[in-house]
Amino acid sequence: MRVAWLSSRQSQRRFLLSAILSAFTVWFLLPSSPKHEEQPAELARQYPMLWRHVHTFNGTGGAWYIPPSWLSSTDVQPETIVDAALLASQAAKSNKNRFIDHSNIPLLLHQTWKNRRVEKWSDLLRASVEKWLHYVVADDMAYFFWEDDGIERMLAEFEPDFAHRFGFLPSNVERADVFRILVLKWFGGIYADVDTRPLRQPTSWVSSSDLAPWSDSVTQMRFSFDNPVSSILGIEADCAPHKSDYWRMGYSYPVQLTQWALASSAGHAVLLRFMDNLQRRMDGVARRNRGNINTPEAIKELRQIGPLCLTGPVAVTVAVKTWLEERTGLRWNALTGSGDGGRSKLVEDVLILPITGFRTRQIRQYGLEAGHRPLSSSLAPGARIVAHLRPESRVRESLSDLVWVVQKLVEAARLTRSQATIEEGGRVFHYA
């Protein structure tokens, strides 16, 4: 009877786990914002800036907008998006008002998507890009919407030695990750995914309070910097380092950065470090595959590394973490906002925003300590951007939630198992 009872409990747990996994799978596949085509006149009325500056724009490699005040009468109108980005980055240098406040970061916004046919887009994407363009025009910013042809032109002109490897990255996810680093490396500015929406003007992303000196509560090391900010990054995971929450949620570090939004001056060292790390990793894969990165075995090895670690948030975190540690002696986990209400921290010329800075619609509150402010409102203090996440992005974002749930179920199973160890007549019975 006892063994049968234990077997029944085990079956119940297995059924519960199976049901939860099935529910997660179904939820992942549900679309968050259905696509539907609308008439051109209606699109032009609802999204006037998107219609004018993206959909109907006639350019090679993408669409762009450069404020008329940035151009002189002698400037030749660019024919490609690469020429336009180069022109705008040079024009920004001639006027201190063409930078984010307190920074060396030019007011250039870069976005990319597979096409400019906005009638095929979801309402979410249309509204998000329209909001960005509203700020672009109001703040006298330059804007660049990169298509595949434009990205290929940029690689051919600025990264000829890497261009062939770019094509051998396992998927479009990795290629998009690398693009955002390279476009900032060469032109500077802000990169933001098309499913994000700004909550405040990019010109005001850096305030005087963000520049205040701060100290590591463990080492007492003090950090201050008098020169302008040259890089802005946001935290996506802020977990207690002495607990296992972060890896249960699928993160590699207790404090981990995001890369769906970032800003930088051109040629910043953390961007160079990211590319050096990627090149070194791809060199190693090629070396183990007879010097070729394009063999099926090499591609398989790159896939096994995974986008998160190869080019995604983990790769960005490693690049920033190692550079700041070497440069300043920073203790990485000192960047947590759990003990100070989530304040920004400036290290060298890199500004690290708290988890509320670049945020998703629903931040995982179980990854936060009680010291953080409530995050239920989209107007969380200090928020610059909110990410709404497309269905394909929701899968990637929610994998960590799935890992966390599974880990909790495993813990519960272990606890039940220990409680169900029964001693009878000098014998100990365990369920398998």
Question: Language model features by range: what are they?
Answer:
Residues 177-189:
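Small-residue hinge/turn detector
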